[in-house]
Amino acid sequence: MSTPSLQRPLQRRTCRFGPQEWEVYDAWTPDAPRADVTVVLVHGGLWQTSFDRAHLRPLGLALARDGWSVASVEYTRVGMPRGGWPGTGTSVVAAIEAVATDPELPDRLVAVGHSAGGQLAVWAASDGRCPALTGVVSLAGVLDLRLADTDEVGSEAVRALLGGAPEQSPQAWADADPTLGRLDVPAVLLHGAADTLVPPSVSASYLRSRGPSDASCRLEILAACDHFGIIGPGHTAYGRVTAAINEVSTAAPAGAGPRA
Protein backbone atom coordinates (compact mmCIF):
# COMPACT_ATOMS: atom_id res chain seq x y z
CA MET A 1 0.00 0.00 0.00
CA SER A 2 1.30 3.46 -0.92
CA THR A 3 0.34 6.35 1.32
CA PRO A 4 1.02 10.04 0.81
CA SER A 5 3.81 11.87 2.58
CA LEU A 6 2.87 14.57 5.07
CA GLN A 7 6.28 16.26 5.26
CA ARG A 8 6.89 18.21 2.05
CA PRO A 9 6.15 21.97 2.35
CA LEU A 10 3.78 23.45 -0.23
CA GLN A 11 2.90 26.74 -1.83
CA ARG A 12 -0.82 27.21 -2.59
CA ARG A 13 -2.44 29.69 -4.99
CA THR A 14 -5.90 30.19 -6.46
CA CYS A 15 -5.67 31.49 -10.03
CA ARG A 16 -8.35 32.93 -12.31
CA PHE A 17 -8.71 31.94 -15.97
CA GLY A 18 -11.96 33.72 -16.87
CA PRO A 19 -14.36 36.46 -15.76
CA GLN A 20 -16.84 34.21 -13.92
CA GLU A 21 -16.31 33.61 -10.20
CA TRP A 22 -15.97 29.86 -10.72
CA GLU A 23 -13.40 30.14 -13.51
CA VAL A 24 -10.45 29.37 -11.24
CA TYR A 25 -8.00 26.64 -10.38
CA ASP A 26 -6.14 25.83 -7.17
CA ALA A 27 -2.41 25.22 -7.59
CA TRP A 28 -0.17 23.42 -5.12
CA THR A 29 3.57 23.58 -5.75
CA PRO A 30 6.02 21.59 -3.62
CA ASP A 31 9.19 23.39 -2.60
CA ALA A 32 11.12 20.44 -4.03
CA PRO A 33 9.04 18.88 -6.85
CA ARG A 34 10.05 15.39 -7.86
CA ALA A 35 8.97 15.60 -11.51
CA ASP A 36 8.62 18.16 -14.30
CA VAL A 37 4.91 17.37 -14.59
CA THR A 38 1.76 19.17 -13.46
CA VAL A 39 -1.16 16.96 -12.50
CA VAL A 40 -4.41 18.63 -13.60
CA LEU A 41 -7.34 17.35 -11.52
CA VAL A 42 -10.85 17.44 -13.00
CA HIS A 43 -13.56 16.70 -10.44
CA GLY A 44 -16.75 14.73 -11.01
CA GLY A 45 -20.30 15.13 -9.76
CA LEU A 46 -22.29 14.30 -12.90
CA TRP A 47 -21.51 17.76 -14.34
CA GLN A 48 -23.81 19.30 -11.71
CA THR A 49 -23.28 22.27 -9.39
CA SER A 50 -23.66 20.11 -6.27
CA PHE A 51 -19.99 19.08 -6.53
CA ASP A 52 -17.01 21.35 -7.06
CA ARG A 53 -13.22 21.12 -6.97
CA ALA A 54 -13.24 20.83 -3.15
CA HIS A 55 -14.26 17.21 -3.72
CA LEU A 56 -10.74 16.39 -4.97
CA ARG A 57 -8.84 18.56 -2.49
CA PRO A 58 -7.65 15.60 -0.35
CA LEU A 59 -6.27 13.85 -3.43
CA GLY A 60 -4.64 17.05 -4.68
CA LEU A 61 -2.97 17.72 -1.35
CA ALA A 62 -1.74 14.14 -1.12
CA LEU A 63 -0.20 14.28 -4.59
CA ALA A 64 1.44 17.62 -3.81
CA ARG A 65 2.80 16.29 -0.51
CA ASP A 66 4.30 13.47 -2.54
CA GLY A 67 6.11 15.96 -4.75
CA TRP A 68 3.78 16.57 -7.69
CA SER A 69 2.82 20.04 -8.86
CA VAL A 70 -0.99 20.00 -8.90
CA ALA A 71 -3.69 22.20 -10.42
CA SER A 72 -7.30 21.39 -9.48
CA VAL A 73 -9.57 23.09 -12.00
CA GLU A 74 -13.11 24.37 -11.68
CA TYR A 75 -15.39 24.50 -14.70
CA THR A 76 -18.80 25.60 -15.89
CA ARG A 77 -21.46 23.07 -14.90
CA VAL A 78 -25.07 22.40 -15.84
CA GLY A 79 -27.31 25.17 -14.55
CA MET A 80 -24.63 27.86 -14.80
CA PRO A 81 -24.45 30.39 -17.65
CA ARG A 82 -23.13 28.52 -20.72
CA GLY A 83 -23.33 25.25 -18.76
CA GLY A 84 -24.21 22.06 -20.60
CA TRP A 85 -22.73 21.14 -23.95
CA PRO A 86 -20.50 22.42 -25.42
CA GLY A 87 -19.94 25.05 -22.72
CA THR A 88 -18.89 22.60 -20.01
CA GLY A 89 -16.33 20.98 -22.29
CA THR A 90 -14.87 24.23 -23.58
CA SER A 91 -14.62 25.50 -20.00
CA VAL A 92 -12.42 22.54 -19.07
CA VAL A 93 -10.22 23.11 -22.13
CA ALA A 94 -9.85 26.78 -21.17
CA ALA A 95 -8.85 25.79 -17.64
CA ILE A 96 -6.22 23.33 -18.90
CA GLU A 97 -4.83 25.91 -21.32
CA ALA A 98 -4.52 28.40 -18.46
CA VAL A 99 -2.62 25.87 -16.36
CA ALA A 100 -0.31 25.21 -19.32
CA THR A 101 0.68 28.89 -19.44
CA ASP A 102 1.14 29.30 -15.68
CA PRO A 103 4.83 30.25 -15.29
CA GLU A 104 5.01 28.72 -11.82
CA LEU A 105 3.93 25.24 -12.96
CA PRO A 106 5.70 22.66 -15.15
CA ASP A 107 4.28 22.81 -18.67
CA ARG A 108 4.05 19.02 -19.12
CA LEU A 109 0.48 18.24 -18.08
CA VAL A 110 -1.23 15.00 -17.09
CA ALA A 111 -5.01 15.25 -16.68
CA VAL A 112 -6.57 13.12 -13.94
CA GLY A 113 -10.37 13.07 -13.97
CA HIS A 114 -12.80 11.34 -11.61
CA SER A 115 -16.25 10.10 -12.70
CA ALA A 116 -17.78 12.83 -14.90
CA GLY A 117 -14.38 14.50 -14.69
CA GLY A 118 -12.94 11.39 -16.32
CA GLN A 119 -15.21 11.98 -19.32
CA LEU A 120 -14.07 15.60 -19.49
CA ALA A 121 -10.38 14.76 -19.10
CA VAL A 122 -10.39 12.05 -21.77
CA TRP A 123 -12.51 14.23 -24.08
CA ALA A 124 -10.00 17.07 -23.65
CA ALA A 125 -7.18 14.64 -24.45
CA SER A 126 -8.79 13.67 -27.77
CA ASP A 127 -9.06 15.10 -31.29
CA GLY A 128 -6.37 17.74 -30.81
CA ARG A 129 -8.31 19.76 -28.22
CA CYS A 130 -5.48 20.17 -25.67
CA PRO A 131 -2.00 19.96 -27.19
CA ALA A 132 -0.49 20.75 -23.76
CA LEU A 133 -1.58 17.37 -22.36
CA THR A 134 1.00 14.58 -22.36
CA GLY A 135 -1.16 11.94 -20.69
CA VAL A 136 -4.51 11.25 -19.04
CA VAL A 137 -5.69 9.08 -16.15
CA SER A 138 -9.39 8.29 -15.76
CA LEU A 139 -10.64 7.33 -12.30
CA ALA A 140 -14.02 5.59 -12.57
CA GLY A 141 -14.71 7.73 -15.62
CA VAL A 142 -18.06 8.03 -17.38
CA LEU A 143 -16.32 7.28 -20.68
CA ASP A 144 -19.22 5.86 -22.71
CA LEU A 145 -22.14 8.26 -22.50
CA ARG A 146 -24.62 6.07 -24.36
CA LEU A 147 -23.85 3.10 -22.12
CA ALA A 148 -24.09 5.32 -19.06
CA ASP A 149 -27.48 6.50 -20.29
CA THR A 150 -28.66 2.96 -21.03
CA ASP A 151 -27.44 1.67 -17.67
CA GLU A 152 -29.03 4.65 -15.95
CA VAL A 153 -25.71 5.85 -14.54
CA GLY A 154 -27.16 9.23 -13.75
CA SER A 155 -29.03 9.12 -17.06
CA GLU A 156 -30.94 12.28 -16.30
CA ALA A 157 -27.62 14.01 -15.63
CA VAL A 158 -26.19 12.83 -18.97
CA ARG A 159 -29.24 14.17 -20.78
CA ALA A 160 -29.12 17.41 -18.79
CA LEU A 161 -25.51 17.87 -19.88
CA LEU A 162 -26.26 17.17 -23.54
CA GLY A 163 -29.61 18.89 -23.87
CA GLY A 164 -31.84 15.84 -24.18
CA ALA A 165 -31.93 12.30 -25.54
CA PRO A 166 -29.66 11.29 -28.46
CA GLU A 167 -32.39 11.91 -31.02
CA GLN A 168 -33.05 15.38 -29.55
CA SER A 169 -29.41 16.56 -29.41
CA PRO A 170 -27.48 14.37 -31.87
CA GLN A 171 -24.60 16.81 -32.37
CA ALA A 172 -23.94 17.17 -28.65
CA TRP A 173 -24.01 13.40 -28.15
CA ALA A 174 -21.62 12.88 -31.06
CA ASP A 175 -19.19 15.55 -29.89
CA ALA A 176 -19.14 14.79 -26.15
CA ASP A 177 -18.83 10.99 -26.16
CA PRO A 178 -15.16 9.97 -25.70
CA THR A 179 -15.80 6.65 -27.46
CA LEU A 180 -16.19 8.54 -30.74
CA GLY A 181 -12.95 10.53 -30.49
CA ARG A 182 -9.32 9.82 -31.31
CA LEU A 183 -7.17 9.58 -28.17
CA ASP A 184 -4.11 11.81 -28.59
CA VAL A 185 -2.07 10.88 -25.51
CA PRO A 186 -1.39 7.74 -23.44
CA ALA A 187 -4.20 6.84 -21.06
CA VAL A 188 -4.66 4.61 -18.05
CA LEU A 189 -8.21 3.83 -16.97
CA LEU A 190 -8.54 2.86 -13.31
CA HIS A 191 -11.87 1.51 -12.10
CA GLY A 192 -12.95 -0.06 -8.83
CA ALA A 193 -14.34 -3.58 -9.04
CA ALA A 194 -16.89 -2.66 -6.34
CA ASP A 195 -18.08 0.54 -8.06
CA THR A 196 -21.88 0.44 -8.17
CA LEU A 197 -22.36 4.06 -9.28
CA VAL A 198 -20.34 3.85 -12.49
CA PRO A 199 -19.73 0.15 -13.21
CA PRO A 200 -16.37 -0.96 -14.65
CA SER A 201 -18.17 -1.96 -17.86
CA VAL A 202 -18.30 1.75 -18.78
CA SER A 203 -14.49 2.00 -18.85
CA ALA A 204 -14.24 -1.39 -20.57
CA SER A 205 -16.55 -0.17 -23.33
CA TYR A 206 -14.31 2.84 -23.94
CA LEU A 207 -11.24 0.60 -24.15
CA ARG A 208 -12.97 -1.59 -26.76
CA SER A 209 -13.65 1.50 -28.86
CA ARG A 210 -9.94 2.26 -29.32
CA GLY A 211 -8.30 1.69 -32.69
CA PRO A 212 -4.84 1.65 -34.27
CA SER A 213 -4.70 5.44 -34.64
CA ASP A 214 -5.20 6.02 -30.91
CA ALA A 215 -2.47 6.48 -28.32
CA SER A 216 -1.87 3.62 -25.91
CA CYS A 217 -4.70 2.88 -23.50
CA ARG A 218 -5.15 0.23 -20.85
CA LEU A 219 -7.71 -0.59 -18.16
CA GLU A 220 -6.88 -1.70 -14.63
CA ILE A 221 -9.64 -3.00 -12.36
CA LEU A 222 -8.91 -2.39 -8.68
CA ALA A 223 -10.13 -5.03 -6.23
CA ALA A 224 -12.09 -3.97 -3.15
CA CYS A 225 -12.44 -0.41 -4.42
CA ASP A 226 -15.66 1.55 -4.90
CA HIS A 227 -16.51 4.82 -6.65
CA PHE A 228 -15.06 7.09 -3.99
CA GLY A 229 -12.32 4.87 -2.61
CA ILE A 230 -10.45 5.37 -5.88
CA ILE A 231 -9.84 9.04 -4.99
CA GLY A 232 -9.04 8.41 -1.32
CA PRO A 233 -5.41 9.14 -0.37
CA GLY A 234 -5.60 6.53 2.40
CA HIS A 235 -6.94 3.78 0.14
CA THR A 236 -4.75 1.13 -1.47
CA ALA A 237 -5.85 2.63 -4.81
CA TYR A 238 -3.69 5.69 -4.17
CA GLY A 239 -0.53 3.83 -5.14
CA ARG A 240 -2.11 2.77 -8.43
CA VAL A 241 -3.12 6.37 -9.14
CA THR A 242 0.44 7.65 -8.68
CA ALA A 243 1.83 4.75 -10.73
CA ALA A 244 -0.60 5.58 -13.54
CA ILE A 245 0.46 9.24 -13.51
CA ASN A 246 4.09 8.17 -13.77
CA GLU A 247 3.26 5.78 -16.60
CA VAL A 248 1.40 8.20 -18.85
CA SER A 249 3.81 11.06 -18.24
CA THR A 250 6.67 9.07 -19.78
CA ALA A 251 4.85 7.16 -22.55
CA ALA A 252 4.81 8.21 -26.21
CA PRO A 253 1.77 10.06 -27.65
CA ALA A 254 -0.25 8.85 -30.62
CA GLY A 255 1.78 8.87 -33.82
CA ALA A 256 5.08 9.40 -32.03
CA GLY A 257 8.12 7.65 -33.36
CA PRO A 258 10.75 5.90 -31.29
CA ARG A 259 12.51 8.00 -28.70
CA ALA A 260 16.08 9.10 -29.31
Tell where the protein language model's regions lie, with residue ranges.
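Short, surface-exposed "cap/lid" segments of acyl-processing enzymes
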Residues: 31-35, 39-62
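Conserved alpha/beta-hydrolase "acid-adjacent" motif
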Residues: 196-205
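Hydrolase active-site cap/lid region
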Residues: 123-169
